[in-house]
Amino acid sequence: MENINSRLIKEFAITMEQAESVIQLLDEGNTVPFIARYRKERTGGLDDIILRNFTERLIYLRNLEERKADVIRLIGEQEKLTEEIEKSINKSETLTEIEDIYRPYKPKKRTRAIIAIEKGLKPLAETIFSGGFKGDINDYAQGFVCEDKLVSNALDALAGAGDIISEMISDEADYRKWIRGQVHNFGSVETKGSSEDTTPFEMYYEYKEGIKTIPPHRILAINRGEKSKILSVKIKADNDKIIDYLRNKCLKGNSETDKFIELSIIDSVKRLIFPSIEREIRSELTEKGEIGAIDIFKANLKALLMQSPIKGKVVLGFDPGFRTGCKIAVLDDTGKVLDIATVYATAGSQDGVKKSIAIIKDLVIKHNVEVVSLGNGTASRESEEILAQIITELKQECSRDLYYVIVSEAGASVYSASELASKEYPDIDVSIRGAISIGRRLQDPLVELVKIDPKAIGVGQYQHDVAPKKLDESLKGVVEDCVNAVGVDLNIATPALLAYISGINAAIAQNIVAYREENGKFKARKELLKVKRLGAKAYEQCAGFLRVMESNEFLDNTSIHPESYNATKKLLDFLNYTKEDLKSLNFKDMDERIKDINFNELALKLETGAPTLRDIIKEIKKPGRDPREELPKPILKTGVVQMKDLKPGMKLMGTVRNVSDFGAFVDIGVHQDGLVHISQLSDKFVKHPLDVVSVGDIVEVSVIEVDEKRKRISLSMKN
């Protein structure tokens, strides 16, 4: 365990105390959101991202220690374990190193070497490989001829001995480690196209890039091309250098045996070592590609979920379509459905379009709609033109302001047909549910998007080339962190949302809703303890992330944990706040009252930690604050810009819709996202686009080039 802790300290640049505390907290069953938010004193303020990476690494290192113990036991059972082997295993830092050491002792299928050993040729191989043999090698090999064992002559015996030596060289852990490093550091990935046709993989038809430097997105693109049988892929390395290295290690200066050993070296490299290391390198590259894709997906998903909500506005959700019509849902400022309609605004006769416009205008006026949330799918461009016309007419006819925002409708159709949607809207047609989802995504992106499988949200890069289980686990962690960072209203939250709260699983989430339906709204956080299967530990983990607006205890509607209520009340008393101040939540002058306070001394006096005290003060100054409100709001539009209107040099405001390894895709309102290539993101060097932009960012861009035929827009964020 000490070894694990030491490695974690180095890798995460933390203290031994931090490492031990985090491990203990995790082993006690505490969740990452709970530890990040309410155990800052013990972790030294490590955030949720570091804690998740720490947890993942801890699991890997523990598995590593288990494998070490297994390999030591397995070699010991063969009575071949030496002190040196055990020491080498314990020093290993990766599973690959352990498997290299175990390789000679691992049960094998019947290889050429094993067949030769069965023929009694191992002593011949060992004698030759030792370099101590004197005399004629062919005469010596004659002594191993045995017709019964299918060793007909000296050449057969030497061929079998060569196979054994080849495998002995291949199984040597130190040799493999050096060769693997050589291939990794100086080798390359080379690809060739098997077709002359134009395909998405055209750039890889004659391609070469260093193993060490190839970026994740190219690895996955090459893998996809290979899987489609459009590309052939090889790992290339300097085999002559590898053979020279093995010559220096294996040749003994014996002219009689060295020629023979050299043939075994060449055979070992070409037949055993290189193909095996090529498979390992390809596997490592795929893992690198998957990690890169998952990291980008996580960052994009987090930014999307944490987009600033548009609160307190009546919204019209607009799901565009042609043949089946456009689906409309009007939502009040809490997301409740006020009205629904189907209009044929983008297809059909002029009379039909006029009727559709009239219906939409009536809905806007009747329900005092302020913003339209327009889905970006089929018929979105045509629908946008209709909306622009409606906005102009409403302004002229009754001086009414109306805006629209184009919203990604990715996953809306999946949600519409889901069991969850059926439970939420049993009496509303499946086709209308998509419009409700599109409208609610504008009102509260987080609450609405957690209902959808993250993979269906459409912000991934090569997500279909990543192991599903690995991707699911990573994305679930992102959603959990976002939901807990914002907090949830206990009395209106759906089971889908509650299930992401720290300490609550799907079953407990259903029990909470069942309790609420049977007993009415929760009156206090502590009432959670009456919910079936929600015990003291689950309550500790979840309470701080659940808000109860109806509670008489105002702290129940903050992110302050119940365990800190006493400290909070002592603080307010210390700062001379009255009961009237508490009732009216009048803490505007808090900064003035605490400006001369020594936080560490006050924390001791209140029997809490300084980080917790700072969090308490931050929350009291703005009870129930939503961290998303500090982020930029979506761009509200009133008119249409078309691709043909764009000219090089034109400056526009846009919203980042997706980020990849090679750049960012920005929505500038023309139904075709423009690409800001990584080289155009800044005047300074940019290592990765995520260092500069995130999904949802509002950015100023200038147009570099427009290709209407290929529907490509090149943008720049340089000054």
Residues of each region from the PLM?
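Short, ordered loop/turn segments at secondary-structure junctions
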Residues: 38-40, 238, 320, 333-334, ...
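Duplex nucleic acid-engaging cores and interfaces of nucleic-acid transaction enzymes
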Residues: 50-53, 60, 64-317, 323-427, ...
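S1/OB-fold single-stranded RNA-binding interface
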Residues: 99-103, 112-117, 127-129, 135, ...
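OB-fold/S1-family RNA-binding modules
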Residues: 270-276, 402-489, 494, 544-638, ...
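Structured core elements
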Residues: 34, 232-234, 314-317, 327-330, ...
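Accessory alpha-helical DNA-binding modules that contact the DNA backbone or grooves
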Residues: 31-32, 43, 47-148, 485-630, ...
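Generic start-of-chain signal for non-secretory N-termini
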Residues: 1-20, 27
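Helical mechanochemical/support elements of P-loop NTPase systems and associated helical scaffolds
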Residues: 4, 18, 28-34, 47-53, ...
